């Protein structure tokens, strides 16, 4: 996966006869997380960071490569009912990743101040930090117990994750971008069970 991202970066930088147009910006949004595990459910999170666009107008007008570096949360939870004690047990974790997407996209100019765009490509997640806790509920009384201070350092979760994603959206006045995206995790986030991230995101960006 790392070799693929490096190859895309080097490939775009090595085009000698193309007018390369760099644009930098900031982005933030909401993550609606899900997982493929039977007993696991996702939690709503967020993403915030910086992005860059490399326009390639001499290749095809509207073609571009999109890069990002974002702090992104991908929370999960799972529950269990203990019949012997009539207690509901729930584990919750909020892992935070450095999310690095590399997408190839195309912009469709609808008017001077309005464009539609679509992009797709791979991403890499690098686990940074995140706590896990257990909540025990008996009747109307709930007790929270810390389980792990860092799910990655304690090796409860895999630190590296990767997958494929796409984005569609609109660009207003050449600066504001509103987008909806979806990421398919291709790697299990645990060693001993097959649980993969699925993330729907809604984001707003400002590109200079």
How does the language model describe each region?
Residues 196-208:
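Outer-membrane beta-barrel "beta-signal"
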Residues 54-59, 108-112, 172-174, 208:
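Outer-membrane beta-barrel strand-turn architecture
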Residues 35-42, 74-96, 127-161, 165, ...:
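Extracellular/periplasm-exposed beta-strand and loop segments of Gram-negative cell-envelope proteins
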Residues 26, 48-50, 69, 100-104, ...:
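Membrane-embedded beta-strands of outer-membrane beta-barrel proteins
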Residues 20-53, 115, 127, 138, ...:
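Short glycine/proline- and aromatic-enriched beta-strand/turn motifs that initiate or cap beta-hairpins
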Residues 30-34, 54, 71-75, 108, ...:
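Transmembrane beta-strands of outer-membrane beta-barrel pores
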Residues 22, 58-63, 174-180:
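Repeated loop/turn-to-beta-strand initiation elements of outer-membrane beta-barrel proteins
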Residues 15-19:
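Sec/Tat signal peptide C-region and signal peptidase I cleavage site
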């Amino acid at each position: 996966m790392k070799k693929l991202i490096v190859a895309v970066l080097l490939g775009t930088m090595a085009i000698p006869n193309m007018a390369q147009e760099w644009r930098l910006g900031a982005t933030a949004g909401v993550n609606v997380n899900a997982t493929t595990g039977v007993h696991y459910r996702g939690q709503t999170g967020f993403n915030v960071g910086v992005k860059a666009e490399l326009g390639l107008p001499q290749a095809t007008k509207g073609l571009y490569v999109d890069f990002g570096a974002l702090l992104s949360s991908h929370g999960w939870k799972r529950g269990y009912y203990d019949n012997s004690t009539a207690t509901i047990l729930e584990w919750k974790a909020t892992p935070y990743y450095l999310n690095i997407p590399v997408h190839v996209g195309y912009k469709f100019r609808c008017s001077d101040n309005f464009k539609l765009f679509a992009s797709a490509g791979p991403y890499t997640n690098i686990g940074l930090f995140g706590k896990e806790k257990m909540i025990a509920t008996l009747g109307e009384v709930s007790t929270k117990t810390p389980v792990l201070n860092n799910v990655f350092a304690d090796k409860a979760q895999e630190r590296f994750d990767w997958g494929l994603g796409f984005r569609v959206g609109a660009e207003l006045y050449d600066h504001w971008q509103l987008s909806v995206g979806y990421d398919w995790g291709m790697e299990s986030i645990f060693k001993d069970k097959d649980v993969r991230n699925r993330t729907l995101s809604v984001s707003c960006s400002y590109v200079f």
